[in-house]
Each structure stands twice: as structure tokens, then as C-alpha cells.
A protein has these predicted regions:
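Short, functionally important structural connectors and interaction interfaces within domains
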Residues: 4-7, 94, 162, 265, ...
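Cellulosome-associated attachment modules in secreted, modular CAZymes
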Residues: 416-473
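Sec-dependent N-terminal signal peptides
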Residues: 3-15
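Histidine-/acidic-rich catalytic cores in large beta-rich domains
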Residues: 16-418
């Protein structure tokens, strides 16, 4: 097992006693470095563990209960390059071994941004899906806004890592509508089909550039999250200023159609929010979202449980905000009045403190009701309470400029006994761990969280007894 790092992170920050006591997982990204390091850090800015990577991150890593991480990364030569480009996904053990690795960077698919680990061990993957200009025209698309003569659409693939098989897949191409060619199968009145996406909505990439040159990005899906209670998926589209909910209970056949699954709607949108002008039930004044990221459900049992929360990058006057809102859930579907847009008309909670970032950004509710917020371009993470008071913060610093796409904070008991009791992180519990813990307690040093075996917030003889019992089996 790797050596346990108890080092002060190069950071600026402060701590309030009301901050949630947890472990923050993050991977700084740098345009100057092709490799990267993932850190697991406590509230005192001490590294508890690190993982090293040969390639930089596409988004944030995910910590699993066995101590492994799922890490989406950037491949050197992607087949389509735009913001958030990735191409690779790997599972890395606590010890740093690569347990499996897959790349989705070919003439059909290019992974980008986020992934989502599922309870069954599978992984949901966001990909661009290549379509020729002619294929787009044949579906009713009127213009292609780039010189590449292609349109990279959107798909979600469910990977079964043990076999390498794609066991479920959703393609937006199966769920489009257009009102320009009545001879095509997807012809319809846009406002009568909020469950479908107007194929002529928005531009397809650009002909300019920046360092990545022209691209053919249409939807720019930048986040994905899964709700195991509902068996539903939510995704976020930066360019369309909307979030969408899909039914994951569908079979492989149902997901490509318009019926089936728990919702009875197949792979069509169950719900969408943020920009009703996209489906003809509003105008620019009705738009709430602008280039948003980090859509996710607040877990059941947390304050706001069942609501959705996101980071709205350009909320007002080029400043950002975190929004929490309650979707109008109705069984396995979502209520909507005929001719009107999906509700709600506004949010339930908003944080508009001194935050702004033009790219990525994160927002996650914590068990105690606080919210963890990532300001990407300054590599800054803050924790605020429900009143908007800032309780904890840090900024990652180093020899080069860093970003942090997003990060999450995990409870101290999330890893079970993986950290607890292993005082020297040598991969085994033995008498040496007892000696180290006893000496630290005698010295009044509680800096190593592995010593708090009963998670009562203190380290004393009870923790030594628990450690002895663990060693004796």
C-alpha cells in the first residue's frame, strides 16, 4: 500500500467548526502538465492519500467504497476536440494499480467530460457521436456551422467493465423533432413535443478556434448523474442551457423508441428545465440557465433530498450561482400543463456569493445541509451553509496554474476500516499501529484521522481497545 501522506496541502483557506468533517477528493488539472495527481484530503488540508496519473483529468474522479477511484482522463490525440475532451476511463486501486482501462476515442465515439459509476459496477459514459453533414441534413438539420462537414451528436453508453460490453445506450439522434420537412419521420410541431429535441436548435460547433481549432460540438453535455431510487439519469447541456432527465429502466430496444420503461416513454425526455424556448414554450426572458454544469440529485435523507442542484456559470452579469430546485415529479414521470413549460418557475435555494467561473464548476449538498462549491478556474473550493455563510475553503496552488473541475466530500466512514486503524498505512493492522496510536494519544496529537476508530470525534483508550480487537480478529 502506498505511504500515508500527512502533508499540508499548498493552499490558502480557513476552517469553521460548522464545516462538514469529511474527506475531499479532487484532481487539479494544468494545461502545462500532461500528468496529474488525485488527492484525498481532510478538513485540515492534510493529504490522506494520493493517486498518480499519466494523463490529465477530463473531469472529476469518483471514490468507491473499496478505496479505488474511477478516473476520466484526456487522451493525447482525440478524434473530436472541444472543451472537456477526455477519451479514457480507468479504475485505479487504493495502491495505484490500474484494475481496468478503456478508451472511447475513435471515428464513432469520443468520450468527454463526465462519467457516472452505477451501483452494479457499470459506468455511464458521455460521448460525442459522429454524424456526417449529410446524415444531419437527412434528419432535417438545416445548417452545419463548422468547416469540418460533420455534426458530433450526443450519446450515453453504459459500460460493463468486466466484459468490456456496452449493455445499454441512449442516442439523442433517436429522439429529435423538426418542423422544416414534412416528409421526414421526425417531422412535428416543436411545441407539441417537449419530450423530443429540436434538431435545428443551437449551432453545431464553430469555425474559429482557440487552441483546439474548429469543432463540431452540438449539445456539449458536461455532467451526468444517476438516481438509483428512480432509476433515472440527469444530464446537463451547456450550449443548450438545459438539463434533461431520462428513464434508465428501459430495455435496449425501448430506449431507442418512445414507449416502455417505468415511465412508459422509452428514451424520450421525461423532464427538461432551464430554457423552454428550445421547445417552443417560452422565449429568452424565460431562460433560467446559462452554460450550467454539475447537475445532480441531492441524496434522500439530506436537507433538500430529492431536489436537483447545479452550478449556473453565467447566472447574472457574468457571475455564477448555485441553484437548487424541485422538479414536479409525478410517479415515474414529471407533471407538465399542456402548452406550458416544465416547472418550477424558479429555484428553492440560491447561493450568489463571490463566485464566478467560465468553465465547469461544481455544487454538491452535504449530509449536514451545507453545500460544497467548486470555482474551477481559480482551483478554489468553498463550503457554505444554508444561509450562505462560508465555513471552509481552500485554493490549490503549485508551480503552474491549476484548475479543479469539480470535487466531492466523502464522510469519514465512507471507506470503512480502509483508513481507520492503519496508522502507518502499510496495508496491515498490527502491534506497530497500536504503538503509534498510543503514542499519539499520549502526546495529545489527533491529526491522524485513522486513530478515531469509533468515529466519535476524539482519540482515546476506546480507540486502542477497538484496534486491539480488530488485530485479534
Amino acid at each position: 500500500m502506498n505511504q500515508l501522506f500527512i502533508l499540508i496541502l499548498s493552499s490558502l483557506g480557513f476552517i469553521n467548526a460548522q464545516a462538514y468533517d469529511g474527506y475531499t477528493l479532487f484532481t487539479p488539472m494544468s494545461v502545462l502538465d500532461s500528468n496529474a495527481t488525485t488527492y484525498l484530503m481532510n478538513n485540515d488540508y492534510e493529504f490522506l492519500h494520493t493517486w498518480t496519473h499519466d494523463q490529465g483529468p477530463a473531469s472529476m474522479p469518483y471514490l468507491l467504497t473499496d478505496g479505488s477511484i474511477i478516473y476520466p482522463y484526456r487522451v493525447p490525440f482525440p478524434t473530436m476536440s472541444a472543451g472537456g475532451v477526455g477519451g479514457g476511463i480507468q479504475k485505479q486501486s487504493w495502491d495505484g494499480d490500474i484494475l481496468w482501462e478503456y478508451e472511447f476515442s475513435n471515428e464513432q465515439y469520443q468520450h468527454h467530460h463526465d462519467v457516472q459509476p452505477l451501483p452494479n459496477g457499470n459506468i455511464l459514459i458521455i460521448v460525442w457521436e459522429k454524424k456526417t453533414a449529410q446524415e444531419a441534413y437527412d434528419m432535417g438539420r438545416e445548417t452545419i456551422n463548422n468547416p469540418l462537414n460533420v455534426m458530433w451528436s450526443t450519446a450515453i453508453l453504459e459500460l460493463e467493465p468486466e466484459s468490456g460490453n456496452i449493455v445499454w445506450e441512449w442516442h439523442i439522434w433517436d429522439h429529435t423533432v423538426q418542423d422544416v420537412n414534412s416528409e421526414l419521420s421526425n417531422f412535428g410541431i416543436i411545441s407539441e413535443h417537449p419530450e423530443l429535441f429540436d434538431i435545428n436548435c443551437g449551432s453545431v460547433g464553430n469555425d474559429a478556434g482557440g487552441p483546439q481549432g474548429a469543432n463540431a460540438d452540438w449539445m456539449h453535455i458536461n455532467a451526468i448523474h444517476y438516481n438509483s431510487i428512480l432509476d433515472q439519469i440527469v444530464i446537463s447541456s451547456r450550449t443548450q442551457n438545459e438539463i434533461f432527465i431520462l428513464d434508465h429502466s428501459t430495455s435496449s430496444e425501448e430506449v431507442s423508441g418512445h414507449s416502455g420503461g417505468n415511465s412508459g416513454m422509452g428514451g424520450d425526455f421525461l423532464y427538461r428545465w432551464g430554457n423552454p424556448e428550445n421547445y417552443g414554450r417560452g422565449d429568452e426572458s424565460d431562460r433560467i440557465l446559462s452554460s450550467q454544469h454539475s447537475i445532480n440529485w441531492i441524496p434522500a435523507g439530506y436537507p433538500g433530498g430529492g431536489n436537483l442542484i447545479l452550478f449556473n456559470n453565467f447566472h447574472e452579469d457574468n457571475t455564477s450561482a448555485v441553484l437548487e430546485f424541485s422538479p414536479p415529479i409525478d410517479g415515474n414521470n414529471y407533471a407538465i400543463i399542456e402548452g406550458e413549460s416544465f416547472g418550477p418557475e424558479t429555484w428553492e435555494w440560491i447561493y450568489t456569493g463571490d463566485i464566478t467561473t467560465p468553465m465547469q464548476g461544481g455544487a454538491f449538498r452535504l449530509p449536514n445541509g451545507n453545500t460544497l462549491i467548486t470555482q474551477t478556474h481559480t482551483a478554489t473550493v468553498i463550503e457554505v451553509d444554508s444561509e450562505g455563510n462560508e465555513l471552509w475553503s481552500f485554493t490549490h496552488e503549485g508551480e503552474s496554474s491549476y484548475w479543479i473541475a469539480r470535487c466531492e466530500k466523502y464522510s469519514p466512514d465512507y471507506l470503512g476500516n480502509l483508513l481507520l486503524g492503519d496508522m502507518n498505512s502499510d496495508g496491515s493492522l498490527n502491534v506497530l499501529d497500536i504503538v503509534i496510536l498510543a503514542n499519539l494519544i499520549l502526546a495529545g496529537d489527533t491529526s491522524n484521522p485513522a486513530g478515531d476508530l469509533n468515529q466519535d470525534g476524539s482519540q482515546n483508550i476506546l480507540d486502542i481497545v477497538l484496534l486491539v480487537n480488530l488485530i485479534l480478529g
